[in-house]
Each structure stands twice: as structure tokens, then as C-alpha cells.
A protein has these predicted regions:
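N-terminal periplasmic "start-of-domain" segments of outer-membrane beta-barrel proteins
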Residues: 26-41
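Secondary-structure transition into beta-strands, especially the periplasmic turns and strand N-termini
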Residues: 186-191, 279-285
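Extracytoplasmic gating/loop element in the C-terminal half of outer-membrane beta-barrel translocons
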Residues: 79, 284-303
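Gram-negative/organellar outer-membrane beta-barrel architecture
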Residues: 26, 42-244, 249-250
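Outer-envelope exported proteins of Gram-negative bacteria
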Residues: 196, 252, 286-290
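Extended, domain-scale alpha-helical bundle/helix-rich regions
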Residues: 4-14, 25
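Extracytoplasmic assembly/pore-lining segments of large envelope/extracellular complexes
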Residues: 263-267
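Periplasmic plug
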Residues: 21, 32, 84-87
Length: 303
């Protein structure tokens, strides 16, 4: 007969007293703190601290994110978390001009900011104008519209394509204007499901030498069409960094369907995946895969 006596020493729990953030001259503290999964006053968790560091790094606002956990003076069961960030430029203002024999002078301008006033909100404004092409768009996204991470975004756009000025075979003109709203719902630590609904109006002018596919479109749907595309997507981001990823993956599954009541009946689906594999300290292998499918329904073709 053999008897065993087990003695278990659970050790001492270590708590996080305070989280200190430095280096964020523009970005507000709350933008960084809301990405932390390690809470003040909670038990110290290496897993939660590493996860928090990755989430802050994936924001794309910082060149570097460093985390230290020094012990609190005269305390054996408490530590502080010191996070030091180095901010990077998150906005851009661009102006451009070009020239081609067919389109003549082409002008473009854009303003974008991924971190407006340090709030973490995104805004962009784009304008492009040429002899045959005009595009204008504005976009805004609040990634934390609610405290639990529900995002809200708006988009508006106008696109004009007029090939008559090319003075070549196949003249037509399209004029599209639209606007939409987007909502993102986090369903897991690295997973987000997004829903969107837009309304757009497209006018098509065809002429004597217009391509047959545009003539067929106007014959089937009319010169002016109204469309209400509903979109749904799932995205997963497990990269180690948004700026310079060296490992991890991203996945995106996207679907779009025209809502009944509009002039178009179609659906589209696509899947996009990226892999990152570290080869050396200076080289990373990047593999990209993408495929999609679309068709019409209710007896109509995919436009």
C-alpha cells in the first residue's frame, strides 16, 4: 500500500494597480484604453496584456508600442502597466495633376485623417476631375459609436463617366449619385460583422455608336435606375501589426444583394484572405487570395 500526500501552494495573486500611457501627444488616452483587455484592479494576465498591445498596435496610429510591468514600490502583489507609444502621421492632404492625349488635364485632390483630433474617428474627402471622368466622395466612420465597440459610418459619392469627349467608337455617359450607412458589430475578440444599406441613382445615356451592352441595359432597365444595395460582411484580423505585419492572417467575407423595390435584382459574394509569414528579421512572405461570384435573380441579369 502506497499513500501520497500532495501539498499545493497557490502562490500570491498579482494585481494591476494602474495603467499609465505616455507618448500620445495627439491621441486621446481613452482611444488607447478602450483597446485594453487588461483592466486596472484586476488580476495580472500576460495573455490579456499581450492581446491589448496587439490591439493598440493594429490601430495604425503608432510607429511603436512598448509595454512594461514594473512592480509597485513596497508592494509584493501589485504592478503597474506602463505603455509607451510613438505616434505616426495619420492624415494626408494630396493634390495632383496629370495630362494624357485622350483626357487632357486630370486633376485630383484628397484629404484623409484616420484619427480626427485624436478621437480615433476616420474621415476622407476625395475629388477627381478629368475630361471623361469625375468622381467625388466623402466618408466618415466612428469605430466606437457605443462603448462596447459598435461602429457607425456614412458614405456619399458621385461618379460621372462621359466617353463622348474621347471622340472614338463606343460613346456613352453614366451619372451615379448615392449615399449609405454602415454599422459594425464586434462578435469576438478579432471578429467584426458589418451591415450596410445604400441608395443610389444611375442615369445612362446611349448614342448611335454606344456599345451593345449599354444599349441592352437601357432596353431592359430603362435610362434611369434606382438601386438599394444591402451589404453584409465578416472580417477577422489576427495580424501582429497594422502598419508592418510580419505574422498573422486577415479574412474578409463580403456579400451584396439589391433590395426588392429597386430597379435591379442581383447578388454578389466575395472572399479575401491574406497570410503573413516571417522569413527573416527583414523579410516577410505575403500571400493573397481572393475570389467572388455574382448573378441576377427574378429573371434579371447581373448588371
Amino acid at each position: 500500500k502506497v499513500a501520497f500526500t500532495f501539498f499545493i501552494d497557490p502562490g500570491r495573486r498579482v494585481y494591476v494597480r494602474r495603467i499609465n500611457i505616455t507618448g500620445n501627444d495627439r491621441t486621446r488616452d481613452e482611444v488607447i484604453r478602450r483597446e485594453f483587455r487588461q483592466m486596472e484592479g484586476a488580476w495580472h494576465s500576460t495573455k490579456h496584456i499581450n492581446n491589448s498591445k496587439q490591439r493598440v498596435d493594429r490601430l495604425g496610429y503608432f510607429n511603436s508600442v512598448n509595454v512594461e510591468t514594473p512592480a509597485v514600490a513596497n508592494k509584493t502583489d501589485q504592478v503597474d502597466i506602463n505603455i509607451k507609444v510613438e505616434e505616426r502621421p495619420t492624415g494626408a492632404i494630396m493634390f495632383g495633376a496629370g495630362y494624357s492625349d485622350r483626357q487632357g488635364i486630370i486633376l485630383n485632390a484628397s484629404v484623409s485623417q484616420n484619427n480626427i483630433f485624436g478621437t480615433g474617428n476616420f474621415f476622407s474627402l476625395d475629388a477627381n476631375r478629368g475630361a471623361i471622368n469625375e468622381t467625388y466622395s466623402v466618408s466618415f466612420t466612428n469605430p466606437y459609436f457605443t462603448v462596447n465597440g459598435l461602429s457607425l459610418g456614412f458614405d456619399a459619392y458621385k461618379r460621372v463617366l462621359d466617353t463622348r469627349k474621347l471622340q472614338t467608337f463606343g460613346e456613352f455617359k453614366t451619372d451615379t449619385i448615392g449615399a449609405g450607412i454602415r454599422v459594425g458589430v464586434p462578435i469576438a475578440e478579432n471578429d467584426i460583422v458589418s451591415l450596410g444599406l445604400a441608395a443610389e441613382n444611375t442615369a445612362i445615356d446611349v448614342f448611335g455608336n454606344s456599345p451593345q451592352r449599354y444599349r441592352d441595359f437601357v432596353t431592359e432597365f430603362g435610362r434611369t435606375t434606382n438601386n438599394f444595395p444591402f451589404t453584409i460582411s465578416w472580417a477577422r484580423d489576427r495580424r501582429d501589426s497594422a502598419i508592418w505585419p510580419t505574422s498573422g492572417t486577415t479574412h474578409r467575407l463580403f456579400g451584396e444583394v439589391s433590395v426588392p423595390g429597386g430597379d435591379l435584382n442581383y447578388y454578389k459574394a466575395s472572399y479575401h484572405q491574406k497570410w503573413y509569414f516571417p522569413i527573416t528579421d527583414f523579410f516577410t512572405l505575403h500571400i493573397n487570395t481572393e475570389f467572388g461570384y455574382g448573378d441576377g435573380y427574378s429573371g434579371k441579369d447581373l448588371p
